[in-house]
Structure formats: C-alpha cells, structure tokens
Amino acid sequence: GCGSFCCTHELEDFQFQIIQTGGSNIVYLGQELDFLADRNGLGREDVLTHELALEFGGTRALKLYQRHCGFRGLCAGCMEKPLHCRLYPFVPEFSPEGELKRLQDASIFDVTFSALGWKSPCTVKTDRAAALKLCQADPDWLAPLRHPYLMFHFASYGVIVDSYTRCLGRATSLSGLTGGAFWRAWELQYLTGKLFDWDYIRSELRCLEATYLEIYGEFR
C-alpha cells in the first residue's frame, strides 16, 4: 500500500541539515493561492508561504509559493489539497497548443531518483509510459488543465527539470556517491543553485512566454 512518501519525505538516507522532512514542501501557483485564500475568506498574506521568484527577462517574474505541510497525509478536513498534491506523482507537460507531451515527476526527489536510475520510495507511482498512454487516450480527462496559465507553468517546470537533470549528470562532486553521503552532498549543491543552468532556463522561459503571448495574449 501507499507509504505516504510524498507527504512525509521520510527516508533513512535523507540526512539533511536544512531541508525539512517529517512532512512535505508543497507549492502553489499565485492565482491558485489567491483562489483558495478568497474561498476561505483570507488574504494571500494570511496564508503562510514563502515566495520563490525567478526573474528571466519576461513581462514579469516566474513566481511560486512554497509552504511546509506537516499533516503527513492526514489532511482531510484540515486543508484543501493544492494542485501540486492532486497531480502527484506526475505533472503533465503540454505544448502551447494543448497537446500532452510528457509526464514529469512531481517532486525534486522523484526527479532525482529517475535521473539516477534509482527506485522511488513512492509505492503508488505507476509506469510513466502507461500513464501517458492512458492520458492521451482520453484527452477530455485533462481538459481542465489546458488553461494557458497552467500550461505555461507546467512547461516552465519542464524546462527547469530538464536543466536539473543534465546538471545532475555532470556534477562530479556527486559522482559515485550513494545513500546518505549522496544526499548530504546533494543538499548543498541543490540549495545553492549549482545543479541548474540558469542562463539556459532564463532563455527558454523567455521563448516560452513569447510563444504563449503570441497565441493567447496576456495570460498571467
């Protein structure tokens, strides 16, 4: 059965100094946060989140909002699950026209497991190819996610994942490490941004935003 890895991030090998475990770091989109706050009679400032902003030279920064959730999977009746949780274990990536291209792992840990060929602790993670085939067989199933605001953010995530995967493969400081030794060294590299090619990411995001603006006009 489900071991709730996505909600606890508890693994013997995780020996972090800074990254919180004993719960999950969940991410909200800006409009999502506003919607949930308004529906519950709150202002955005009342929802305890940490803003993550990436200036990439577009019309405005790419922003996400992160918070630590300590419910450990027992959140029914306590909070509304964000889209991040509802989509797990995959994030769909669409073309700007709305065609489903691929399914990305929904957490940095699962991205790392996949990139290194390690088995994920997530016991409900299905075969990616089979899941993609299932989604493509019924386009209407993902229709609510084919909004330009959502698709842009999903595609932006794909750009970041691609950069991370390449940089991880070239990280000589992590080469040959496994278990706790790997994750201790990884934490510092990850949190200091050394596992990302920021010039590539910014360039790709500028092109991506320009394409969406051409097709949809102002969308975020």
Please give the residue ranges for each predicted region.
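Short loop/turn segments that flank or connect secondary-structure elements
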Residues: 1-220
